[in-house]
């Protein structure tokens, strides 16, 4: 009975999917576009950054270029290369090629040169369309055909009418190159009819109309761009091209979609996981494609819009099946790939190409109008993959190599790959191609590449190899990077003595070992604590670093620790009546070593109420010396989220205690006799403002929150206070707590203290306990007073020769700029962000520093020097380095748990002349950083506090134009059991300079402000600049150069087998690097 029912289902399905749905069968892509241009001539067709074209304008420009191509010999099925940056011109070029009768081949300019060269040669393209900024690359790869540089073509005088060239739906439209098993990419040939069918499908299934605004997210070399481009342009809708900078910044991406009111977007699921539905309210359809989606991701989005999961290889005109998440179902448990789209046939077959019944696993094969013509110049592969369709005589069927099965509801479940092809971050990758590249290396005898899954269910590539001679992972990575695009590079390379085999003597891929992320690093066995002090340190390290198991011989740096977290360790020791200097932890980075420096202390910091005048610290004097416009609007802020909601009364009780506890938060600033006086008001008056808003009926929660937070930012009053603003936003899906504090009284470490106190106090209040916060350390007032004394002591004045030497070496050479404009305002500031992947960040934090015993700042600055050497062509550069400013310079002082603005600023000279070899430059940077006395804290004290007669010949003439600051793992401190970082990050977006929320009318205080922090396990670097001084392209070049050099440093350090020490690691004063190298070489020769 059940078998008969299954047969009925299968028969019904076959009948349904072979029914023809009408579409524009006799028309080509450009004809369908021309119909839209005629129907909607004045509607916006395409938008990129600040430029837009109407359908009429886009059509006319494409017609003009098409006529030029005809004169150059383009005709039916001619192959034309399109090698351009993502832009409006890119789309014009594609339409022009189609109108002239040709087929376009998109070539990604970021591909390795070998791959670009191969695609140009293999496709036999006689013409390449490009832009001036890319034209040199076309020539550099050895292309000898005709190059048409669109920027230089005189097209305006040409006829703008449609060409009406003869065309057929079976003409070639485009050739997409994808990964191939032979080690070379293969070109898939697609015809017009497949896209003509999609036009009808878009309108029938998605209801796409001229009212829609559709995003172009994908790279133009990826077939998803064809889907996005023609979904809009064949329906009269507007196409919005997303820049790489917007795509690489999740917050900017969300803002762009909302601000431009996009209605349809197609994204890889791996990208969508970083977005928040409430922040993109204009979307009506979300489509995921390129790799498998997940039930949690679907459930997160499906009730906010139409969620579509799409599947389809390049060989079938992009899309073969879709599945729409049911809106009437509370949650989904799995995500199938759905049912075939119109005029597309799906067959699940066995090895003999016989149909399998519902529930049986088999190979997924595809037929229908979207099928590709085959592979360019690969008749053998075409015959293998495009076989005669046994179910429809006279037609072909594409064998995908995917494993799938029909479900009883008529949908298809995707089960993975039969062969060794995978999809990672939306890219279909033939593992055999990577293996072939590795096997071409002269020292590699065997190579296997597989896709593995990390703890976050994300996929990565891992290469295993056997080599007869020494071939390190770093060497292989460099070699592969010259042959393969970035998305095909394995994340890890593992050397094996032999490959695991199955009983049939085939490589057992399932038995390949997981990569050791700490490969080539010394890994001591676990050593438990032996004393009470060691046990306390282990507990504190586990809490601060977020690591469950830590032994007493584990290295603080290797566990990802940095100087800011070292301060947190010191602060938490204070609650055990134990004292440790931060420098001791940094110098002796294992618990076994540093426990010897931990001392009991009976001295307790004053826990009473502080009031009265407080001397300005150096950084505060710097601030008032700048005479910024709107000094009241120079804040830092955060937004916290609690799904269960916050109790307003509890929040106020906790804030009352926090403001009472931390004296700096009660400051005001008066002008007396031409001077700024900092005054602590004690407990009198309004010490903070609290606001509560009920947004449960608000349709746009994000907009409401961001509007109010900006109002609060601009309402600070330095003279009268308060300088703390708190706002509670209650919504249907949890509450959001906004905290804004003027920068004069808070810094990055202060925020960590406040988050901890807020969590502690809130938990106590919820449990019905009295609020009792951890003890504070010495007051901000005491610290400032001690600095006044320290400023003229011999200990500090002994630093003067170092700073005098730096001034004498520094040449005041201006940073190159695109526009020589001064007095720029914050409203002109733009941000560009780059990110490292989590695995790259982990390598930087936990492994890279072991090679040369460096700190993270050493490596970040080494990369900065290499980037500026490449970008600026200067011989040297002086940067302003920002530090936390809580150095151990005053013996009796303990400010590890004190709130206030402690930041130090000091100049660092980077030599840009001798940047090779890489190992020497890393060591040189480290040694130069170690020579800076006391982490640079003394420089600003000398400048702003020391008596002029005690400053020697210091002139403080050095005026760096670049500021660099690494903030550490900031967002981890916002995650507690009670609250997390809010997805409404308007208040978290610290502002135009990458750190602070400043008045738009405030002056830009540095030409380039570079800020690094760890966010969501990723290193994020923000490059802030004024658009009145720099073009976006210039900063993009700098940021990309920085990322390239930083990754090279990480790779170099993590693959280094031996730890190499430098003079600063030893106590011999005056030892030079060259002398130490000689000593080590002598030792090595002696021991041979």
UniProtKB/Swiss-Prot annotation:
Which residues belong to any copy of the Carrier domain?
A: 528-602
State the UniProt keywords alphabetically. Antibiotic biosynthesis, ATP-binding, Isomerase, Ligase, Multifunctional enzyme, Nucleotide-binding, Phosphopantetheine, Phosphoprotein
- Tell me the GO BP annotations in alphabetical order: antibiotic biosynthetic process; lipid biosynthetic process
Instruction: From the UniProt record, list the reaction(s) this protein catalyses.
Output: L-phenylalanine + ATP + H2O = D-phenylalanine + AMP + diphosphate + H(+)
Which InterPro entries does the UniProt entry name for this protein?
Answer: AA_adenyl_dom, ACP-like_sf, AMP-bd_C, AMP-bd_C_sf, AMP-binding, AMP-binding_CS, AMP-dep_synth/lig_dom, CAT-like_dom_sf
Where O-(pantetheine 4'-phosphoryl)serine occurs, the residues are: 563
- Pfam families the UniProt entry points to: AMP-binding, AMP-binding_C, Condensation, PP-binding
Cofactor binding annotation: Binds 1 phosphopantetheine covalently.
PANTHER family for this protein:
ENZYME, PUTATIVE (JCVI)-RELATED (PTHR45398:SF1), PTHR45398
Supply the name of the protein: Tyrocidine synthase 1
Lineage, highest ranks first: Bacteria, Bacillati, Bacillota, Bacilli, Bacillales
């Amino acid at each position: 009975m059940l078998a008969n029912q299954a047969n009925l289902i299968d028969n019904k399905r076959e009948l349904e999917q072979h029914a023809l749905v009408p579409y524009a069968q006799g028309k080509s892509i450009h004809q369908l576009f021309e119909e839209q241009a005629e129907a909607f001539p004045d509607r916006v067709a395409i938008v990129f950054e600040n430029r837009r074209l109407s359908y009429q304008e886009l059509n006319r420009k494409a017609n003009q270029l098409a006529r030029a191509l005809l004169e150059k010999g383009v005709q039916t099925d001619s192959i034309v290369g399109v090698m351009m940056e993502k832009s409006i011109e890119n789309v014009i070029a594609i339409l022009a090629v189609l109108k002239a009768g040709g087929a376009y081949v998109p070539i990604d300019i970021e591909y390795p040169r070998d791959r670009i060269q191969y695609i140009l040669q293999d496709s036999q393209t006689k013409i390449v369309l490009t832009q001036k900024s890319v034209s040199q690359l076309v020539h550099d790869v050895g292309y000898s055909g005709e190059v048409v540089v669109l920027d230089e073509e005189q097209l305006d005088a040409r006829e703008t009418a449609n060409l009406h060239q003869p065309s057929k739906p079976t003409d070639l439209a485009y050739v997409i190159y994808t990964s191939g098993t032979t080690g070379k990419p293969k070109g898939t040939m697609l015809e017009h009819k497949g896209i003509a069918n999609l036009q009808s499908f878009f309108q029938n299934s998605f209801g796409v109309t001229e009212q829609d605004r559709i995003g172009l997210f994908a790279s133009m070399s990826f077939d998803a761009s064809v889907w996005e481009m023609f979904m809009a342009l064949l329906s009269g809708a507007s196409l919005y091209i997303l820049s790489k900078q917007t795509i690489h910044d999740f917050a900017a991406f969300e803002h762009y979609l909302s601000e431009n009111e996009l209605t349809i977007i197609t994204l890889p699921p791996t990208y969508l996981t970083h977005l928040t539905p409430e922040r993109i309210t204009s979307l009506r359809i979300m489509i995921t494609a390129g790799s498998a989606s997940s039930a949690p991701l679907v459930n997160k989005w499906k009730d906010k819009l139409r969620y579509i999961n799409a599947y389809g290889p390049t060989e079938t005109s992009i899309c073969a099946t879709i599945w729409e998440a049911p809106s009437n179902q509370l949650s989904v448990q799995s995500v199938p790939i759905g049912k075939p789209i119109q005029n597309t046939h799906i067959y699940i077959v066995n090895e003999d190409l016989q149909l399998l019944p519902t529930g049986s696993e088999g190979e997924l094969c595809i037929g229908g109008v979207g099928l590709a013509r085959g592979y360019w110049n690969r008749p053998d592969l075409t015959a293998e993959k495009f076989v005669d369709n046994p179910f429809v005589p006279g037609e072909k069927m594409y064998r995908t190599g995917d494993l799938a099965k029909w479900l009883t509801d008529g949908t298809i479940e995707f089960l993975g790959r039969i062969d060794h092809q995978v999809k990672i971050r939306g890219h279909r990758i033939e593992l055999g191609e990577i293996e072939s590249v590795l096997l071409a290396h002269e020292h590699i005898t065997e190579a296997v590449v597989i896709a593995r899954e990390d703890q976050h269910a994300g996929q990565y590539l891992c290469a295993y190899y056997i080599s007869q001679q020494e071939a390190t992972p770093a060497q292989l990575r460099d070699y592969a990077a010259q042959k393969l695009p970035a998305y095909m590079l394995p994340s890890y390379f593992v050397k094996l003595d032999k490959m695991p085999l199955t009983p049939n003597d085939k490589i057992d891929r399932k038995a390949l070992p997981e990569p050791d992320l700490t490969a080539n690093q010394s890994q001591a066995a676990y050593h438990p604590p032996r004393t009470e002090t060691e046990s306390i340190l282990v507990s504190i390290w586990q809490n601060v670093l977020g690591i469950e198991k830590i032994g007493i011989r584990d290295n603080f740096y290797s566990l990802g620790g940095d100087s800011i977290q070292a301060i947190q360790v010191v602060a938490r020791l204070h609650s055990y009546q134990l004292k440790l200097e931060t420098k001791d932890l940094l110098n002796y980075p294992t618990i076994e070593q540093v426990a010897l420096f931990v001392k009991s202390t009976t001295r307790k910091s004053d826990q009473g109420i502080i009031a009265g005048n407080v001397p300005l610290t150096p950084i505060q004097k710097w601030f008032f010396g700048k005479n910024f416009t709107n000094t009241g609007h120079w804040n830092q802020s955060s937004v916290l989220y609690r799904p269960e909601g916050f109790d307003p009364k509890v929040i106020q009780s906790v804030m009352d205690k926090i403001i009472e506890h931390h004296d700096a938060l009660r400051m005001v600033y008066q002008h007396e006799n031409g001077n700024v006086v900092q005054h602590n008001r004690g407990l009198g008056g309004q010490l903070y403002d609290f606001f509560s808003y009920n947004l449960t009926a608000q349709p746009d929660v994000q907009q409401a929150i961001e509007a109010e937070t900006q109002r609060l930012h601009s309402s600070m009053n330095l003279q009268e206070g308060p300088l703390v603003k708190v706002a509670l936003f209650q919504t249907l899906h949890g509450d959001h707590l906004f905290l804004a504090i003027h920068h004069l009284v808070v810094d990055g470490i202060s925020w960590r203290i406040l988050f901890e106190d807020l969590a502690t106090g809130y938990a106590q209040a919820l449990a019905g306990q009295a609020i009792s916060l951890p003890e504070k350390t010495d007051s901000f007032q005491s610290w400032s007073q001690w600095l006044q004394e320290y400023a003229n002591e011999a200990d500090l004045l002994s630093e003067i020769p170092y700073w005098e030497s730096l001034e004498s070496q520094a040449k005041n050479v201006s940073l190159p700029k695109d526009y020589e404009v001064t007095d720029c305002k914050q409203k002109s500031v733009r941000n560009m962000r780059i990110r490292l992947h989590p695995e790259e960040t982990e390598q930087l934090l936990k492994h890279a520093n072991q090679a040369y015993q460096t700190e993270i700042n050493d490596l970040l600055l080494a990369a900065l020097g290499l980037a500026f050497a490449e970008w600026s062509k200067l011989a040297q550069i002086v940067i302003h380095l920002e530090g936390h400013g809580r150095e151990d310079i005053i013996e009796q002082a303990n400010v590890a748990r004190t709130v206030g603005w402690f930041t130090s600023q000091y100049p660092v000279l980077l030599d840009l002349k001798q940047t090779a070899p890489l190992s020497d430059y890393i060591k040189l940077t480290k040694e130069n950083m170690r020579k800076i006395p006391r982490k640079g804290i003394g420089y600003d004290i000398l400048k702003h506090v020391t008596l002029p007669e005690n400053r020697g010949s210091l002139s403080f003439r050095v005026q760096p134009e670049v500021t660099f600051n690494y903030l550490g793992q900031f967002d981890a401190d916002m995650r507690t059991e009670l609250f997390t970082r809010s997805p409404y990050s308007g208040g978290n977006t610290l502002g135009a300079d990458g750190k602070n929320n400043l008045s738009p009318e405030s002056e830009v205080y540095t030409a380039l402000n570079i800020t690094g922090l760890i966010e969501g396990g990723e290193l994020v670097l923000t490059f802030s600049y004024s658009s009145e001084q720099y073009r976006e392209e210039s900063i993009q070049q700098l940021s990309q150069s920085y990322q390239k050099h930083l990754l090279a440093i990480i790779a170099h350090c993590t693959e280094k087998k031996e730890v190499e020490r430098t003079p600063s690691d030893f106590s011999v004063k005056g030892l030079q690097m060259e002398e130490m190298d000689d000593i080590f070489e002598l030792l090595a020769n002696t021991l041979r």
